[in-house]
Amino acid sequence: MKLFYSPGACALSPHIVLLEAGLPFTIEKTDLRTKKTETGSDYYAVNSKGTVPALQLDDGRVLTEGPAIVQYLADQKPDSGLAPRAGTFERYQLMEILNYITSEVHKGYSPLFNPKISADWKASALANLGKKLDWLSGFLGGGKAFLMGTTFTVADAYLYTVLRWSEHVGIDLEKWPVLTAYRSRVGQRPKVQEALKAEGLAK
């Protein structure tokens, strides 16, 4: 398998999952501005959406969209604990939190990366995102180590990836001590550190 990524972008999530699952894979860096991969290939030929992540299987098929990719990877190693078994209620709970991260939290960060955003729009976007972070803080409160309880899952890889963007867009995550502790806890995992180093995000 080959994972197409851009350092620090949302492809970090499946990168972490690949390592946590112990699956064989390679990575190929992609420039999202030029839509060229580090080997000089046209990235649109891999993913016509032009976004990362994209996972190219050994048979040439390509899967895109982070939540779909991480569940596919978890299902390749069902005993890893990275996702509840398909068809169980717990699996639908995992899908619920993945959907929340992608449609509310990830989406909430996106406009803040726009350098042309107006002051009023930025203030509104920050306020809206703050409400999502409030909910996550409450959801993780009460001593939960991870989103699904005591077990690290693909949802944690995704939320960790998104929370890493906070300082880059002017969000002081210290306002949410539960989320700060959570991000630190996930970030200390050996495979998370390995992914960060591979993408040039840590020494």
Regions found by a protein language model. Give the residues of each.
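Short, flexible loop/turn segments with low-complexity composition
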Residues: 85-86, 194-201
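Carbohydrate-binding/catalytic loop surfaces
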Residues: 119, 201-203
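Conserved beta-strand edge residues that scaffold enzyme active sites
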Residues: 32-33, 180, 200
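GST-like domain detector, emphasizing the conserved glutathione-binding G-site
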Residues: 1-123, 127
